């Protein structure tokens, strides 16, 4: 419904929409006409801006809509038209949820008082408080009194309540008494369902009624048995008693199962020992300790798999076989990378160590240098050594130096060449000289004069350097 603020103190209705077809059944056309009349009367009323009423509360609090609960409709409504209109909508909702109860109560003999009088067709007709009080019996559904006979269930319809004046609070006491009676009937029905026998009631004890299927079950048939004496064979139990009985039986069944398992185990393990027939009521302390240890071991194993899975690439399968297979492949690949890096590290370290030794061996004023380094794996009869020749100059012919050294070694009988390596080193910026390094690994057999050999090599290099 759309409202307009008038002079910042009152609200008047500009437009409204009333959905009658989806909520009012075809059999209650009089009730629908009453609700529609209340709706038009509600639209024509002028409502002051007060925060404790609707729709002023929505405008003052800037709310798109306000949900009115049934217990708040008396307090939030501003006038009697609003109250009766809201409670007519509540009755329509209850009729939609409980169609069978309303069909049962709306018999022709007792439905005349629900039919509203005819209003004149002029636009000046309105609902007075006296007319509104005539339909106050529609505010809440009437609850039938339980029957005290053991016959078939005949649900009586209560007579219409006295008219209730919606203005004075002292006239609302019958309404609250009716509500209290309804709540008591609901409570008795729930208790009857919970404490009743497990066998379903006879279908012949209640009349068959046709209506729309709902998710709720009828309870008035149980209310009618309140005055009936309980059968001796039926034992009424509360929900707590039934729960305790269930868990007691569950505990007994578990103990019996443990006893059978232990009896089977003892019969197989100690059949010839003569000690059979002695059963325990549960697992022993050793078995419990073993079970606890096994559970902890599984938990640690699952945690280890979780940690290993977090280290693998994203997209890896989560099953344990896939995790182990991919982890093994990753470890093999990483081990290969580590081996390559270690080999490269050794090469770089050897190169740096050789360059440092060369820089230490060759002084700035020297043009060449010859040095011999013994290998620790040598023996007294067969020795292995490295002969290093460092030569510096502007123009150096590497092939001539290699030929001279090889010719010299060929002349010595007890010296054999194992390997040879030659390389050049770049000098600092601005220095045009070249440093040539030749490393020869030699094997010496028998007697050998190291100083004479080193001096002979120096003469060969000196002849080429000059």
Curated annotation (Swiss-Prot):
Entries under PROSITE patterns matching the protein: BHLH
Keyword GTP-binding: no
Gene Ontology cellular-component annotations: nucleus
The protein, known as: Putative transcription factor bHLH041
Locations listed in the record: Nucleus
Xref: InterPro entries: bHLH92/bHLH041-like (IPR044658), bHLH95_bHLH (IPR045239), bHLH_dom (IPR011598), DUF7049 (IPR055477), DUF7050 (IPR055478), HLH_DNA-bd_sf (IPR036638)
Record field: compositional bias (Low complexity): 120-129
Residue segments, region Disordered: 108-129, 194-213, 260-289
Gene name in the database record: BHLH41
Alphabetized GO MF terms: DNA binding; DNA-binding transcription factor activity; protein dimerization activity
Record keyword Ribosomal protein present: no
Gly residues: bias regions: 268-279
Assembly description: Homodimer.
Species of the source: Arabidopsis thaliana (Mouse-ear cress)
Record domain bHLH: where: 285-334
Keywords associated with the record: DNA-binding, Nucleus, Transcription, Transcription regulation
GO process terms (BP): regulation of DNA-templated transcription
């Amino acid at each position: 419904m759309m409202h307009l603020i008038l002079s910042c103190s009152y609200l008047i209705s500009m437009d409204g929409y009333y959905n009658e077809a989806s909520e009012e059944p075809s059999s209650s056309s009089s009730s629908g006409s009453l609700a529609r009349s209340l709706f038009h009367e509600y639209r024509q009323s002028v409502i002051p801006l007060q925060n404790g009423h609707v729709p002023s509360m929505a405008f003052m609090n800037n709310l798109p809509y306000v949900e009115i609960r049934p217990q708040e409709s008396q307090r939030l409504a501003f006038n009697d038209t609003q109250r009766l209109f809201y409670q007519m909508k509540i009755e329509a909702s209850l009729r939609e949820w409980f169609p069978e109860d309303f069909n049962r109560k709306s018999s022709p003999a007792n439905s005349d008082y629900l039919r509203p009088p005819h209003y004149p067709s002029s636009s000046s007709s309105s609902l007075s408080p006296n007319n509104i009080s005539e339909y106050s019996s529609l505010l809440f559904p009437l609850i039938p009194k339980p029957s005290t006979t053991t016959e078939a269930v005949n649900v009586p319809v209560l007579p219409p309540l006295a008219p209730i004046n919606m203005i004075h609070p002292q006239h609302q006491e019958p309404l609250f008494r009716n509500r209290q009676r309804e709540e008591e009937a609901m409570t008795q029905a729930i208790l009857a369902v919970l404490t009743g026998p497990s066998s379903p009631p006879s279908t012949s004890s209640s009349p068959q009624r046709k209506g729309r299927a709902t998710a709720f079950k009828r309870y008035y048939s149980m209310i009618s048995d309140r005055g009936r004496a309980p059968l001796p064979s039926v034992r009424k139990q509360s929900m707590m008693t039934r729960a305790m009985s269930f868990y007691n039986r569950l505990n007994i069944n578990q103990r019996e199962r443990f006893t059978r398992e232990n009896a089977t185990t003892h019969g197989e393990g100690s059949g010839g020992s003569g000690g059979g027939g002695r059963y325990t009521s549960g697992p022993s302390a050793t078995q419990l300790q073993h079970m606890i240890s096994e559970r902890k071991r599984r938990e640690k194993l699952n945690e280890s798999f979780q940690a290993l899975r977090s280290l693998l690439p994203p997209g890896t399968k989560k099953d344990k076989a896939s995790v182990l297979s991919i982890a093994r492949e990753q470890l093999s690949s990483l081990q290969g990378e580590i081996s390559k890096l270690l080999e490269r590290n050794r090469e770089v370290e050897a190169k740096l160590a050789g360059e440092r030794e060369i820089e230490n061996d060759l002084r700035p004023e020297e043009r060449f240098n010859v040095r011999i380094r013994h290998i620790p794996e040598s023996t007294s009869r067969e020795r292995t050594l490295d002969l290093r020749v460092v030569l510096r100059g502007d123009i150096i012919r590497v092939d001539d130096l290699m030929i001279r050294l090889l010719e010299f070694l060929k002349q010595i009988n007890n010296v054999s060449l194992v390997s040879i390596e030659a390389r050049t080193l770049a000098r600092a910026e601005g220095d045009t000289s070249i440093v040539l390094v030749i490393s020869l690994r030699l094997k010496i057999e028998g007697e050998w004069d190291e100083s004479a050999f080193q001096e002979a090599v120096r003469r060969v290099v000196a002849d080429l350097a000059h």
